[in-house]
């Protein structure tokens, strides 16, 4: 039995219940996730989300956070008061000093906050980058009863997430401060996800900002190959970007220290580039999959090629028949080396342009993409057959204009299995003209002619399914384990300071979820709410959440447990293939739990770390005007 973080309530909002709503009653400290209708002081109230026994109708909080779930409906009639009652006073208090098992003190993070070159304050009043490590949150992963009929939960896992030199006495330099995510936290519940996607492999020929690293590994491969009886490789071949982190280390990858091999680097890695000899993140994923299978859970593994920083050569590769053959053969080779993988994920950002600066692009990218997928499908089927079939997935933009250049309907017709819709980064500081939601499911009610400023996941899904005819079960809806922030935000005009110091964890404008939970959003005291001067708010125009602090106009668009659960419910209702996150190493389990519950999975009461029910509340309601509405004035 897990020591469960128990709230003051006794029934989870997510629990299955036959009771949809209660008949009108006198207020009497009702508690739970059901819909209650009560009379208090001559008025009728209903709860809009989880309600605690100590929340008194009509009494709000002083800081603007929605601590009180009761919403005024109407005046009670004299007949109702006579028959039901009319309490007018209350003498209840919240449980005080609730234990705080989500947050954990991490001395390295605290020391970093106080460094003169960092000078971070949790209210956003000083330095904007926190360099918060994942260690500030305890693992909060619940166990859920398996159900093969429900949509799947996936997550990308990055091969740089494990690093944090502060664990070894470093941290004086910015590049030494890392996330320090430990894969061992998932070892405690290997059934958290249905698929994990190892990210990223690079492509020989890369010309982007990672080109030197790609070239180093490429040269190292070719230097080792002759002595191992292997052919040398050329442009188009996929390579690991971090041989030591992928194959050699035991730190933060769920492996015992003795399994590490510090000699592994670009010039020595090739003998270890296989499933049975790998340590590093690849070895950790191997062991995680074994643990999942041992407990009866099928954990699929995929490997992703490209991503934002490694997509520079896709266009040239896809256009060249010889390099396509090299690429396809190298993907087959990776599957042979690592048979634990069942899927290859192509993350080309983006066909037709719009990716990182310096990326090659062409008007023919869409048609060449089809050739690449077609040839890859043919080679995989020829080598592995049906019984050991390997899937092909892509990560694609959530922006309709970019989707149109990817020829996705033809990709599906030529063998594409899954589409991971990157329904995040709709907003971001510097590139966005206005503050907005970065990972919202729904568009504003009337986006009008300015819809490019108010994007949404649903609009992208509508294009894929209704315009291109993509089957819903091939689409996986993305949620973000990080926020997008701005400073100097004005909620009326949606203006912000474009080049200002926006709050972030490791980079400007990108606070990660564990950092958000530590510094800006309270998830520990019965409800999701803001803290340290931040207010959790819900835009009723798009049904999306954000955090806002008036002190400096700090704005953080984010997915909360409520919005992630909402995405899971949408996926289940519309029979999508599932939901996924970028990235699993930015979450402590709260958002993964919310996704599971939204998809319809039921928590195992004997292995439930946290009751998620109270965390599904909306924030303080506000109506953010669409850009069309603002411009029409």
UniProtKB/Swiss-Prot annotation:
Free-text disruption phenotype from the record: Cells with a disrupted yenA1-yenA2-chi2-yenB-yenC1-yenC2 locus are no longer pathogenic in C.zealandica larvae.
InterPro entries: Chitinase_II/V-like_cat (IPR011583), Chitinase_insertion_sf (IPR029070), Glyco_hydro18_cat (IPR001223), Glycoside_hydrolase_SF (IPR017853), Glycosyl_Hydrlase_18 (IPR050314)
Activity control: Toxin complex is secreted when grown at 25 degrees Celsius or less; at higher temperatures the proteins are present intracellularly but not secreted.
pH sensitivity of activity: Optimum pH is 5.0, in the intact toxin complex optimum pH is pH 4.0 to pH 8.0.
Keyword Methyltransferase in record: no
Keyword entries, A-Z: Carbohydrate metabolism, Chitin degradation, Glycosidase, Hydrolase, Polysaccharide degradation, Secreted, Virulence
Origin superkingdom: Bacteria
One Gene Ontology cellular component: extracellular region
GO MF, one example: endochitinase activity
Primary subcellular site in the record, as a coarse category: secreted
Catalytically driven reaction(s): Random endo-hydrolysis of N-acetyl-beta-D-glucosaminide (1->4)-beta-linkages in chitin and chitodextrins
Domain annotation GH18: ranges: 151-602
GO biological process: chitin catabolic process; polysaccharide catabolic process
Subunit: Semipurified toxin complex consists of at least YenA1-YenA2-YenB-YenC1-YenC2-Chi1-Chi2. The Yen-TC:K9 subcomplex is about 26 nm tall and 22 nm in diameter with 5-fold symmetry and 5 copies of YenA1, YenA2, Chi1 and Chi2; the chitinase subunits may be solvent accessible on the exterior the complex. The Yen-TC:K9 subcomplex has no insecticidal activity. The native complex with additional YenB, YenC1 and YenC2 subunits is 16 nm taller and is insecticidal; the toxicity-conferring subunits are present at about 1 copy each.
Function noted in UniProt: Part of an orally active toxin complex (TC) with strong insecticidal effects on larvae of the Coleoptera Costelytra zealandica, Acrossidius tasmania and Adoryphorus couloni and some Lepidoptera larvae. The TC has an endochitinase activity. This subunit might aid infection by degradation of the larval peritrophic membrane.
Family in the record: Belongs to the glycosyl hydrolase 18 family.
Name of the protein in its database record: Chitinase 2
Species assigned in the record: Yersinia entomophaga
Gene: chi2
